[in-house]
Amino acid sequence: MARNKHPEETVSLILDVAARLFMEKGYEHTSIQDIIDNLGGLSKGAIYHHFKSKEDILVAVTDRITSESNRMLADIRDQKDLCGREKLQAIFKESINRPEQDAIFTVAPNLGANPKLLFSMLGETISDVAPNYIRPILEQGIADGTIEAACPLELAELIMMAANFWMNPMVFDDSVEKVRNKTVIFCQMMKGLGLDIVDKELTDRMVELTAVYQKNR
């Protein structure tokens, strides 16, 4: 078989097709064969040359979405006209409302059944998002007096673990009501930490996304 001179184009095509099928059918209801059937003649071998499993494809699709999210985080972190508190508020508002969230919850992977993706997301949160995006904002807020807190790195990790995992119905397969209750507790926790920056909008949006997830399972 001739060597593929443009492997990055093949990978991009596979991810484009997989992302579309995950959106249309849901991750759990999309098979490797479904992806092959929509690749315009590419063989199963072409897929397995780049990805060992459907879960590997999901991780790569999610990495694409994460890169968009990180650009948003960097833009807010680097704004010169916002104090630390305002930046943290903006992070929550933009994160929960960005269109990519609807895509993720529509794909509806059960993270408990896909440990590779869950571990990848956990590693990204602890090694990159918390220290490189959230901690600098907390440090700025502490310095400018708009945030009263200690241990900004550990606080950044706690906030992101709660927001990205504990409240995430794709991790614990929670009902709409359970997620609603968790967001209420999260808001109370943030207030207790001196971070009264989340409101009913967060609760309503998390309930909305949970309903999307449950519908597409």
Model-derived features: positions:
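Amphipathic alpha-helical core segments of compact helical bundles
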Residues: 93, 160-164, 168, 187-191
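Helix-turn-helix
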Residues: 2, 13, 21-56, 60
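A short secondary-structure junction motif
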Residues: 42, 68, 98-106, 141, ...
